[in-house]
Design a protein with these regions (language model features):
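Rossmann-like AdoMet/SAM-dependent catalytic core
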Residues: 18, 32-81, 88, 96, ...
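SAM cofactor-binding core of SAM-dependent methyltransferases
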Residues: 57-154, 163-166, 193-196
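Short, structured coil segments at secondary-structure junctions
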Residues: 106-107, 182-183, 231
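Short amphipathic alpha-helix with an adjacent loop that forms part of the alpha/beta core around
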Residues: 148-158, 177-180
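Short SAM/SAH-binding signature in class I
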Residues: 159-165, 186
């Protein structure tokens, strides 16, 4: 362990929570900023709002996800269990930093979709072992509400699946609304944290939409909560980074999650700077050998 990390652990490693913060914060940032961010995260997670053990943000950590989604997804399925351990994720880019790589390593199978040919080529190279054993498919496709169901059918996936993850920086709301071919038990979807509750807003649908890097994208958390209710889902939490919301099918959620299932209760503001943090060395997916 480097002197820098030893100092960090000494300063913030007094409890399990703070040790988690130290691990989460180690990586790309200089020592002073690591310490500042570690203290900030620790302070936020130890506030009364986050004291309830049902609050998912307490369980976040990063392995291959952009921020703390890996830990939250793990905790959701610890509570509700799994069925066919099948996922679909779109907007994966090159697959190195997304919400389902850890699931692949945990033995899941699924489908990735991305609209860029070079990303799909890199996925086929970097994840060749998962293609070889038949657990991963990847399709190059520009995703919109008109195409999404046929893409699932092309991949031979329909009916119940355990997880759907949506991050396309634009039409996320409209694409989720259009999905009929699959019925995921859990949905992870990006929300626009600039549009705080109670605002219920979504950008108008444009099948050719591409994100321009501004705050004009996607849907507010309240808009997604309302759509979720229409589709039979309840909001169970948001990532600490304020990037993703987590929904669970009503009949699956039971009493496992914090009430009320409202945007006001679960909203997290944008802390996108946490995407600069790593879980250690630069990410490199397996294959690993299970022993």
């Amino acid at each position: 362990m480097s002197d820098q990390n030893a100092l960090l652990n000494q300063l913030v490693g007094q409890t399990d929570l703070l040790a988690q913060v130290a691990r989460y914060s180690a990586g790309r940032l200089d020592q002073a900023l690591q310490l500042d961010l570690a203290r900030y995260w620790a302070d936020e997670l130890t506030k009364p709002r986050n004291a309830d053990p049902r609050r998912l943000v307490r369980f976040g950590f990063k392995v291959f996800s952009q921020c703390d989604e890996d830990g939250i997804i793990q905790e959701i399925f610890r509570r509700v269990g799994t069925t066919n351990r099948t996922f679909i994720e779109f907007g994966v880019e090159a697959g190195v930093e997304c919400n389902t790589v850890k699931l692949l390593l945990d033995g899941w199978r699924g489908l990735w979709l991305d609209g860029t040919a070079t990303n799909i080529a890199n996925i086929r190279t970097n994840f060749s072992a998962f293609f070889d054993d038949g657990r991963l498919q990847a399709l190059e496709a520009f995703i919109n509400a008109e195409s999404i169901n046929s893409l699932f059918e092309k991949a031979g996936i329909s009916g119940n699946i355990d997880l759907l993850s949506i991050d396309i920086d634009g039409n996320d709301y409209w694409v989720w609304k259009a999905i009929e071919v699959v019925q995921p038990r859990v949905v992870v979807i990006e929300y626009n944290a600039a549009l705080r509750p109670p605002l219920s807003l979504v950008v108008p649908y444009d099948p050719k939409a591409r994100w321009n890097g501004s705050s004009y994208f996607g849907a507010s958390l309240e808009a997604l909560v309302r759509l979720g209710r229409e589709k039979g889902y309840r909001l169970v939490g948001c990532s600490f980074s304020g990037a993703n919301a987590f929904f669970v099918k009503d009949e699956v959620a039971g009493t496992h999650f914090l009430d009320p299932a409202t945007a006001e209760e679960h909203y997290e503001p944008s802390r996108y700077f946490f995407s600069a943090l790593t879980s250690g060395h630069p990410p490199q997916p397996g294959p690993f050998v299970s022993v």
